[in-house]
A protein has these predicted regions:
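Glyoxalase I/VOC metalloenzyme domain signal
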Residues: 1-42, 54-107, 118-119, 124-137
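Short acidic/glycine-enriched loop/turn segments that link adjacent beta-strands
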Residues: 45-49, 115-119
């Protein structure tokens, strides 16, 4: 049996603001093809269809592009399935500022997320961490 701890693991706190892991976002061509009985939510702001699944205790957000203008469309075109990792924060504006201090760049300012009860989300990019989504608690 493997030990669930790793020697030398470093704990980092980039965004502060009671930051907690929320989900992983994956690009898919068709949610219906994967899960025929699932009813995805259409988010016209993000230009995606969204559905959530639970994979052994981890929430996975499935993202299907609405059309070629969706940011997810290019992910699939380039065969990139992993879109982002999402963290829930108590104050999205403070978390953005903390991220900027650590080299993150805002690629989408806070907007309501239809699939998440219209809570604010934003996306940041870092060359080492890739794309991170922040979700207002």
């Amino acid at each position: 049996m493997m030990d669930s701890t790793f020697d030398g693991m470093k704990s980092i706190d980039i965004f502060k603001e009671d930051c907690k892991f929320h989900h992983i976002g994956l690009s898919v061509k068709s949610i219906d093809a994967l899960f025929p009985n699932m009813k995805p939510v259409t988010d016209p702001i993000q230009r995606v269809k969204v559905a959530f699944i639970n994979l052994q205790g981890t929430t996975i957000e499935l993202l299907e592009p609405l059309d070629e203008t969706s940011p997810i469309y290019n992910n699939l075109k380039n065969n990139n399935k992993l879109c982002h990792i999402c963290f829930e924060v108590s104050n999205i504006d403070n978390a953005i500022n903390n991220g900027k201090k650590k080299g993150f760049h805002v690629i989408q300012k806070p907007v309501p997320a239809v699939a998440l009860g219209n809570r604010k989300i934003c996306f940041l990019f870092h060359s080492d961490y890739h794309i991170v989504e922040l979700l207002q608690r």
